[in-house]
Amino acid sequence: MAARPVSSTTSTCRPCRPAQAAASKPSTSSSPGTGVLVGVPRERGSSVSKAAIRGARLEAAARCSLVRQRPMLLATVAVGSLVAAGAANATEIGDSLLGSSGLALADLSIGDWFGNLLYSAGQQANEAVQDQLSALSFTSLAVIFGAGLVTSLSPCTLSVLPLTLGYIGAFGSGKDRSEVVGNSVAFSLGLATTLAILGVAASFAGKAYGQVGQGLPVAASGLAVIMGLNLLEVIELQLPSFFSDYDPRAAAANLPSSVQAYLAGLTFALAASPCSTPVLATLLGYVATSRDPIVGGSLLLTYTTGYVAPLLIAASFAGALQSLLSFRRYSAWINPISGAFLLGGGVYTLLDRLFPATSMVM
């Protein structure tokens, strides 16, 4: 029985062909005693030749399979790297989104944070004043001056700010810078005088603004609410009949502008006095216990100077504000805006006195 010559019918990749060709090429080396080629049919030893050829084929197929699997292995590694990189990027993006959401939450609570900051600053100013009152010095006066600055930033102060700016714009119209600043100083002195008189009165009476109970602060807050409603034209206040023929503007028109500003400052101090607690209550309490009018007047004057310092800064630019904002053109809005702030400030201070906050978390 003649053996069929070995032929390759399997399609292989290019790297596999040399190995397979080598396996199918006739061998020039002969086995001992045979002297024939591997591919030549023979009766004896044919099984050995077929086994050798089969082994060569299997080896070539194994090599080809490794070569074929290598691109798949590289592709698998590449895909795995991309997946890992994508996961890392997703983690970074997630962290950035969490950070941005945290910033958004911080932006949403910035109003509360700023309000808590002002409240904490006021409390710390009050504590600093209490510490400095134990031993008066020039440092004590500087601390009290700074406490006045902090108090001027309280929300309650906004209730009189539109009226103050409107008045500054009114008496600053058509006047030079020096006259405007002089009138503003007179206005501030009117504020300081009222609070200094309160200090002197407390020293003589032996009672403090903060020691007379809830009556005076609540009454002042209620007055602010009533005046705010009046400016908003919700309620109408009627003066007694003997004031019907009296025009305060006509009477004040005959006075110098600085005197008018001073008198206006006296009036504005009464409206702003509820905004000065608790620092003012601490000062007046100390003045009442010391029973020294000179010390009382000096401390209150120092405090009020710091309290009106922002007003003096605003007065320095009163002429520019007058030309840029044209207060007279928008004078119809002054009363409603002032009424809204007075109403809001009055309600705020009233609730603060009736329901004082025991703790404030930053």
Curated annotation (Swiss-Prot):
The chain crosses the membrane at residues 71-91, 97-117, 143-165, 185-205, 215-235, 268-288, 294-314, 331-351. It comes from Oryza sativa subsp. japonica (Rice). The gene is CCDA2. The keyword Transit peptide applies. Keywords: Chloroplast, Cytochrome c-type biogenesis, Electron transport, Membrane, Plastid, Thylakoid, Transit peptide, Transmembrane, Transmembrane helix, Transport. The keyword Transit peptide applies. Residues 1-41 are annotated as: Disordered. Disulfide bonds: none annotated. Probably involved in the transfer of reducing equivalents from stroma to thylakoid lumen and required for the biogenesis of the plastid cytochrome b6f complex. Residues 21-40 have a biased composition (Low complexity). It is a multi-pass membrane protein. Pfam families: DsbD_TM. Residues 1-63 form a transit peptide. This is Cytochrome c-type biogenesis ccda-like chloroplastic protein 2. GO terms for cellular component: chloroplast thylakoid membrane. It is found in: Plastid, Chloroplast thylakoid membrane. GO terms for biological process: cytochrome complex assembly. Belongs to the DsbD family. Coiled coil: none annotated. Residues 1-13 have a biased composition (Polar residues).
